[in-house]
Structure formats: structure tokens, C-alpha cells
Amino acid sequence: MTVQIDELDDKDLDEIIANGTLDGAKQGAVDSETMIQYYRHLFPWKYLFQWLNHGPVVTNDFAHREFAFTLPNDAYIRYLSFSNWEELKKEALNLCPSRFEVGPVYSANPRDRKTIRKSTFHPLKKELVFDIDMTDYDDVRTCCSKTNICEKCWPFITIAVQVLDICFHEDFGFKHILWVYSGRRGIHAWICDEIACSLDDRSRRMIASYLQVVVGNPQGGVRLINNLKRPLHPHLTRSLNILKSAFVKIVLEDQDPWASKEGAENLLKLLPDKDLASALRKKWEVDPERSSKNKWSDIDTVLASGSIASISPSVIAIAKQDIVLTYLYPRLDVEVSRHLNHLLKSPFCVHPGTSRVCVPIDIERMDSFNPLKVPTVNDLLQELDKNSQNDNGHGPTMETNTTENQKDNARGQSNKGHGFSTSLNPYTLYFKSFSSQLFKETVGNKRKHENLEF
């Protein structure tokens, strides 16, 4: 059970550490020593600072930012804040969190919240965030379920990102969108534009509602979509055009969800005419081996035969559009997006269950991104050791009886601080580039504002 330590003073926290009550970590994929090595040699602390601070000189965008640590024993510490990235790194090495989250910028330093009036302590701004979790597709994917993913079902996430990214740019004018793999089965979007960070809860709820199309089904089975009016909203028309091009490959071929009798019934339930459903059911009983792709085509074939007079082709066309949206439109955890004070796992954290790093993804390379090939923290440390051996001329390995300082020095020389000699390098460089572009625009906006105040 998670223990919240959100009301502790620094003195209290120091006492807990001194008494060793942070021990007793769960047996997981990543041990504390591995995490310490990762935080010391691989985590891009400086670039994380530049991303959140929007510049090289410390501002309240970083100094008044809330961080929350999840400790190895599942204790959860909120309202941490730091003056610079060195302090953040030092605390991470001290407490060795299994993960940490980023929250809003507050009106005062979160560490001082007990010494000021509650009315003066409130969140001011935070990136607008979105979360897509593969488990929300369990009713339409056949290859995996729960926390499992594979190369067949990950395209559900890929096409969802494509739909949302275009929407963020074209419908809202956002420019700086950081997509981050969650480490196991999902993806997070951080919209970092200044105007997005300043949105209040009401505005965030409106944007989340604008994007929410697929909702739960009280009766179970395939999820439903909101009652969509025709003609479709331009956002949905654009989204449908994107999704239709991927529907055959992702749904009909890779998932083949209607191959079985039970699966076929799920399709028939989504059709608005009982006579059409009955005719299709009889056809498939005669030929039960028909694939989902063939059954999808059968809808038009039976309708074109003229044997079903109770419904028009236009109604069926609309129904098929709705089915495409039901299966492929992005499924969002909207609660993540609705509130300014919501915390979200930081980029480059390590997922404790998979050991994979939560890497940022270049949107231009989203189609080729494979979550199963994302480096694990153990892979990265092995790469560092191998590179340190090469750099030192067959120097000491992690298996020899060298001291920890010798190992650290070897790793540090090879790593140059941010894992540039490992497979984390492309993700780190992309994050650096993203942060630099965000900083340039932030500075440009400030200069424009200053020029207007003459």
C-alpha cells in the first residue's frame, strides 16, 4: 500500500532516511543500486531543467515547480522543489526514487507551503498533458490484453498520436508537443506552449471534452462512441480520413477481431438494421472461416444485392464510419488532462515493471518507433561498462573487484554526463533539441512583450 508523505518537513524526511525506514523495497525489475547508477550517469538532468525552466538562468518555472518522488517502498513524497538541476539530482541520488513526477508551478515555493497562508498558495501553470493507455483498447485488440503489448497492437497508439498531433497543431495552434513513451503500454503528450501551460481547469476540461469521442460501454463489450451528429465536425472528418487509411491493416488484418462467432456478433451489434444483421449472420454460418476483412466487405455486398429494403446505403455508410471511429479513434484518460494540479511521470524515468526508459519520441519517427526495442536501464549500464573498457584499453569491468569510485569514473568518462555513448543518445539529443526550440520561442515572446511596453 502506498504511503503518502506529503506533509513532512525536511527535518522529518532526514530522520526517516537516517532510521532506514525507506528500506524494504518491493522486489521489482530494477534494484536501488541500478537506479542510483542510472541517475548518476545517464539521466539528462540538465536538459530536464532547461525544458521546465525555459532558459539557462533559474526562474520560478523551475524553482517553484512541484516534484513528487515514489520511493522504493512505495512511500510517496509530494511538494518537493529544487533551486537547480544539481539539487534535483542530489536528492534523487539520496532518496533513489523508483520514479518521480512533475507537477505545476506554484505561486510560492512548494517547500514553504506550511509557512504561508493557504489562500496564497495555488498552482499557476503546468503543461497541458494527455495520456493514452493500451489497456483501454482491450475490447478491440485480440493479440494482447492488460499490461501486455506487441508489434500488432502498438499501431493503435501510433495512429492515435497522428490524429491528436494534427489536431493540437491545426485546431489549437500548439507548436511544442513532447510525446513520451510511458515505459510499458502507453504514451504521454506534454503540450509545452506558454498559452497551454497557462490554461485554467475549465479550459483544460473543454479541450479534453472536445477530444473525447470513445466512451465506456455499461453493458460491456466493445466501447461506444458519443452520439455524433452529421455532418461530422471538421476535426472528426479529418480524423476519419486518417483512420480509414489504417483501418484495414491495423484492425481487419492484424487484429482480425470478427473472425470468431463471438467476434462477429460484436460487429453485428454495431449495425443499425436487424434485417441486415440477420442476413450477414446466415451468410457467415455457412462460411464460418471468413476473415474480418471479408466480413467487412460482406456488409456492402449484401446491401448491394437489394435483398435488404429496410435501410438505405447512406445509413450503413454512416454506421461503418462510426465503427472505424469506435475501433481506432484515440482513447484518452481525460482525468489526466482536466486539472492544473495533476502530476505526471517525468520523461526519462524508468518503468519499474519493464526496466524500460520513458523516452521522448520524435513525431517524425513515430511510425518506426517500437516500444519493445526501447533500451532498459540494465542494457544502458552494460553499454556504459563496455564503452568504458574500450576507452580505457580493456580496463576493469563491472565483474572485477574494482571500487565503486573506479567504476563510476570509468562510466563517467565514457558517458560524458548524459549517456551519449549509449543507445539512449538519440532520445537525449532529441529532448535537448526540443528544449532548445521551446526556450528560443519563450525568449522571443518575452522580447516581443517587452518591446510593446515602451
Curated annotation (Swiss-Prot):
Residues 389-404, 411-420 have a biased composition (Polar residues). It catalyses: ssDNA + n NTP = ssDNA/pppN(pN)n-1 hybrid + (n-1) diphosphate. It is found in: Nucleus. Mn(2+) 2 binds at residues 131, 133, 333. Keywords: DNA replication, DNA-directed RNA polymerase, Magnesium, Manganese, Metal-binding, Nucleotidyltransferase, Nucleus, Primosome, Transcription, Transferase, Zinc. InterPro entries: DNA_primase_S, DNA_primase_ssu_euk/arc. Its main location: nucleus. Mn(2+) 1 binds at residues 131, 133. Gene3D superfamilies: DNA primase, PRIM domain. The keyword Cytoplasm does not apply. Mg(2+) 1 binds at residues 131, 133. Its EC number is 2.7.7.102. GO terms for biological process: DNA replication initiation; DNA replication, synthesis of primer. Belongs to the eukaryotic-type primase small subunit family. The bound zinc ion is not a cofactor. It is bound to a zinc knuckle motif that may be involved in sequence recognition and the binding of ssDNA. This is DNA primase small subunit.
